[in-house]
Design a protein with these regions (language model features):
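Active-site core of glycosidic bond-cleaving carbohydrate-active enzymes
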Residues: 81, 349-385, 407, 414, ...
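Beta-rich accessory regions
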Residues: 154, 162-165, 173-193, 199-200, ...
Length: 754
């Protein structure tokens, strides 16, 4: 019997190895027959701090340049006014029933002022008309290299270095040498036309008030320096040579001064000492990406969904890196259209930043996901200052619409000054801790941050007639847009979810640190808040206020997903509530959905084990809401009724929610129990994943063949209690593990290996 079990185990391992080898041979990425001619369809490259968009403009091959920390950070003078307060908003809404003064203070300036805002760097251009027809354009996400091949035999290769702040290009087999130009943004008006200028013209770069930067060219090098607002400036240094006949190669560096992420050595000085050629830099670059992709892999029988997942995780690795800012609306791909980006390219904390980091945890990219909590820790002081100035209490609430430094920008008041934003952000500290099982992180950052959020909720809340806590005014993004009834006098399910999650997490964290007095206090606070409001339609927006129209934001269901405060594992009554809520959203129709609605809904459908519905919505997202380069464009690009919105502002959160949904279909551990393939579509007969991460610091690999789970391998990084649903017995296996221990589960055995 032991021999038979061992044989089965070995066969499973061999099949898994062969399966993984087959996966590595599959191409994932982008392939076109022409170079894109629109900036939001360009080939994206990036390393978290600098980014490129490769496209063709006016007969030139254009490498748009971006730097994640290049911001105009001018202060908002209105936010220094004495009337700037939560109490002022409460008085205007509750007593005067009039938002006009609130709009004048918080909203109006964002429609006429051009800053604070993210700003573009410029572009490198090569005239390519003489190269003739393009044969192939290809981005291989496994190497993060873009290759363009022309029918004349010329080849261009491009990458943004994964290990430093440089980019590289190389052309081979050129019929004649190409010239190179560095195009700077136009900050002074010269009468030229601008692409797609909106009516108020607030997006014009010329409104920032800068002088055009200084460009210096000597032989085969160019240096460009641009002064922005205050102490912020940017420098680009570009150099090139011809190391062989018909070959042109070069490199460039982008640096800043005056930001949290600026260098001590600027680009020109750095490039004077930089001696790496294209090939040397490429080896280091591809080594980094090899390591990145070794963290986790998937294989699906649906090649469209599989390729999109790899594209999303490529963008994740390109947009979120240690010692760089986190993912903002467009990350390192600021609009290359002569304007400031949509919504200023800011940090939208009512959904966008949060969704952008959903896939990092279970995809086992903790270093990249840690970038978000690193930034939240960095802006903690500014958040506490904002809390004192606007809410007039101690504790921590972060502006919902924020700059690079976490300061308020403004916009629709119910959301730009949302009263529980930090509760959702606290969830990311919680997830980083739970997936990494890092007690040091818990003690030094996670609990101190979450504790201050909990303290803020205690201080800002009031008691109602039933002695239950409530907010003086509440909101539910982005219900009722910017109207008076977007402010609720009864605490919404969105705000309540943020509050209840924060107290639940704070108590759990305090317990883990042995702080029993703290834990007891947070639990007492939790008991003072009401339960979630619901009716026959499911979860409502607020008590006695059901969702009655199609809406893009699923804020009223936050308690279910992503928080897991409500889960179908909690019994039939809760399961019915969740399913009614999802059904009601679908029943109201998709008229006012946008791309991220489909991907968020797919996550929810995976949580209720409805893989077919999840896959269906993910396919709609790809075909209707994504640019050919995979960028999420928010509106229905097919104009086939998937929403009434047909515009195309580019933001990334929908992309990363897509990746998260795929991962929810393959593995779930949010309840503390690992489940593999919980939401596989009916037609999928085989799938596999390698080294996905579960809560508790467990790395999980599993294969699914002929419509059945074949094997599960779990490695315990830190030790601790493992709970896994054994698909062969349908029983929950619970056991204490040691650091490094490997458990293999097959149809006939569970085997340990130290």
């Amino acid at each position: 019997m032991k021999t038979k079990k061992l044989l089965i185990l070995l066969v499973g391992i061999i099949l898994n190895i062969n399966h993984l080898q087959a996966k590595t041979q599959t191409f994932h990425g982008l392939q076109f027959n022409t170079i894109p001619t629109i900036w939001d369809e360009a080939i994206p490259l990036g390393n978290g701090i600098i980014g490129n968009l490769i496209w063709e403009k006016d007969g030139n091959l254009r490498l748009a340049l971006d730097r994640a920390d290049l911001w105009d950070l001018r202060p908002v003078k209105e936010f220094e006014y004495p009337s700037y307060s939560y109490q002022f908003v409460c008085n205007e809404v509750i007593r005067n029933k009039d938002l006009s003064k609130v709009r004048a203070l918080i909203d109006d300036r964002s429609r006429k002022d051009c800053a604070p805002t993210k700003i573009p760097v410029g572009a490198i251009e090569f005239p390519i008309s003489k190269l003739g027809k393009v044969k192939n354009v290809r981005l291989d996400v496994h190497t993060a290299v873009c290759t363009i091949t022309w029918e004349c035999g010329a080849i261009g290769k491009f990458f943004t270095s994964a290990i430093d702040k440089t980019g590289h290009f190389r052309f081979e087999n050129l019929p004649e040498m190409l010239s190179i130009e560095l195009q700077a943004p136009r900050f002074e008006d010269d009468g030229s036309s601008i692409q797609r200028v909106s009516a108020p013209r607030t997006h014009l770069l010329t409104r920032l008030g800068y002088k055009n930067g200084k460009m210096t060219q000597r032989n085969n090098s160019i240096v460009y320096r641009q002064k922005a607002y205050g102490k912020v400036s940017c420098e680009v240094a570009l150099k090139w040579n011809s190391p062989a006949p018909q070959v042109l190669e070069g490199s460039y560096c982008i640096t800043t001064q005056g930001t949290w992420y600026s260098e001590t050595i600027q680009a020109a000085d750095f490039m004077k000492e930089y001696t790496k050629n294209f090939q040397t830099a490429l080896v280091e670059h591809t080594n980094w990406w090899n390591t990145y992709w070794e963290k986790s892999q998937i294989h699906l029988p649906d090649p469209v969904l599989e390729n999109q997942w790899y594209l999303e995780m490529y963008k994740f690795g390109s947009a979120s890196r240690k010692n760089a800012p986190p993912i903002c609306l467009q990350a390192v791909w600021t609009a290359d259209n002569g304007q400031t980006p949509p919504w200023r390219g800011d940090f939208h904390n009512d959904l966008n930043t949060q969704l952008s980091y959903w896939p990092g945890y279970s995809a086992n990219h903790l270093e990249e996901s840690r970038v978000f909590t690193d930034w939240l820790w960095k802006i903690k002081d500014n958040g506490e200052d904002f809390t004192r100035r606007f809410f007039k209490v101690e504790g921590l609430n972060v502006p919902c619409i924020a700059t690079l430094e976490g300061k308020a920008i403004g916009g629709w008041s119910p959301y730009s000054h949302q009263p529980t934003t930090s509760g959702w952000l606290a969830h990311h500290f919680y997830q980083q801790w739970k997936y990494e099982a890092d007690t040091k992180f818990l003690e030094s950052q996670a609990y101190p941050w979450v504790k201050e959020v909990a303290r803020y909720f205690e201080n800002v809340s009031v008691k109602d007639a039933k002695n239950k806590r409530k907010l003086p005014l509440s909101t539910s993004p982005e219900i009722n847009d910017n109207e008076l009834d977007a402010w609720f006098q009864k605490t919404t399910n969105y705000d309540l979810a943020n509050i209840r999650f924060t107290y639940t997490a704070a108590a759990e964290m305090a317990d883990a640190l042995g702080l029993k007095k703290d834990a007891a206090h947070w639990r007492r606070q939790l008991e003072e808040w009401p339960d979630f409001a619901s009716d026959s339609t499911g979860l409502t927006i607020a008590p006695d206020y059901p969702l009655t129209v199609s809406h893009r934001h699923l804020s009223h269901m936050l308690a279910f997903h992503p928080f897991g405060l409500l889960d179908i594992s909690q019994g039939k009554e809760v399961e019915s509530l969740i399913k009614r809520s999802i059904h009601h959203v679908e029943e109201l129709g998709n008229e006012f959905w946008i791309g991220y609605t489909y991907t968020w809904l797919a996550n929810m459908q995976a949580r209720i084990f409805d893989g077919d519905a999840a896959a269906r919505n993910l396919h709609i997202f790809i075909k209707a809401f994504c640019s050919p380069n995979s960028f999420h464009l928010n509106g229905d690009q097919l104009k086939k009724g998937y929403t009434s919105f047909t515009y195309r502002p580019f933001t990334l959160e929908g992309n990363f929610a897509f990746a998260s949904a795929i991962q929810e279909m393959l593995m779930q551990s949010h309840t503390g129990i690992i489940r593999v393939f919980p939401a596989i579509p009916e037609g999928w007969k085989e799938a596999s994943f390698d080294k996905m991460r579960a809560i508790g610091g467990f790395l999980v690999s599993a294969s699914y063949q002929n419509g059945k789970v074949q094997s599960i391998t779990i490695q315990s990084e830190k030790g601790g209690i493992l709970k896994v649903l054994n698909p062969f017995t349908n029983q929950i296996e619970k056991r204490e593990t040691t650091p490094g221990e490997i458990i293999k589960i097959t149809p006939n055995t569970i085997q340990d290996r130290p």
